[in-house]
Regions:
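N-terminal transmembrane-helix/juxtamembrane module of multi-pass inner/ER membrane proteins
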Residues: 1-46, 80-106
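Membrane-water interface at transmembrane helix exits
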Residues: 22, 55, 80-88, 125, ...
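Membrane-helix interface segments
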Residues: 28-31, 61-65, 93-94, 128-132
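Alpha-helical transmembrane spans of integral membrane proteins, capturing the lipid-embedded, hydrophobic core
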Residues: 45, 49, 69, 73-77, ...
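Interfacial segments of alpha-helical transmembrane regions
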Residues: 55-78
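Small-polar-interrupted transmembrane alpha-helices in polytopic inner-membrane proteins
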Residues: 70-86, 134-146
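Membrane-embedded catalytic cores of phosphoryl/pyrophosphoryl-handling enzymes
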Residues: 96-185
Length: 185
């Protein structure tokens, strides 16, 4: 008699949420293409650094703000990497989840893409003189959803990344304002 193979548990909880997102967007191949593009853009916060540098060059009056945006995005990425190394949560691994992009590590919590994107959105809005919520509303949801669609993060990884990115942006603003006023933080 052949040896019985254990049945894979059905998707539940956060895995079920990933499967639901992937299933909902399965009929839209352009969504996957955009998600992969966002992944490459956000890798190691490179895209945000490039946009911040461009802003600093094109807007000399607002150069400081653009440099703070780039530094804040990079600091947010670094903070996410540090938290990943402490928490050590593995990326989603379930037969129902399609992994649609490569990753530099197997650690998932928090999403460094969501972290750096949130910090960049807040700080670049500030640098451009736009309402903070406008940049965050335009940039954060697509990146956050892309991490789930690509099958490389649980929703809680993304939510934690957004929170961490907002916290890093708040610290960056506080430091910048303090330095401009000559006040020690």
């Amino acid at each position: 008699m052949p040896e019985a193979r254990p049945l894979e548990a059905p998707a539940s909880g956060e895995v079920a949420a990933i499967v639901a997102v992937q299933s909902a967007l399965n009929e839209r191949p352009e969504a996957l293409t955009v998600a992969q593009g966002l992944s490459y853009f956000g890798e190691h916060s490179i895209g945000w650094l490039a946009l911040s540098a461009l802003g600093a060059v094109l807007s000399p009056r607002r150069r400081r703000g653009w440099l703070v945006a780039g530094g804040g995005a990079f600091a947010a990425h670094a903070a996410a990497v540090l938290v990943k190394r402490v928490v050590r949560r593995k990326r989603p691994h379930h037969p129902a989840v399609a992994v649609n992009v490569g990753t530099p590590s197997q650690l998932s919590f928090p999403s460094a893409h969501a972290t750096s994107t949130t910090a960049a959105a807040i700080l670049m809005s500030r640098a451009a003189g736009l309402p903070i919520g406008l940049g965050a509303a335009a940039l954060v949801p697509p990146m956050a959803l892309s991490r789930i669609l690509l099958g490389v993060h649980y929703p809680s990884d993304v939510a934690a990344g957004v929170a961490l990115g907002a916290a890093v942006a708040a610290v960056a603003v506080r430091l910048d304002v303090g330095l401009q006023r000559g006040v020690s933080i």
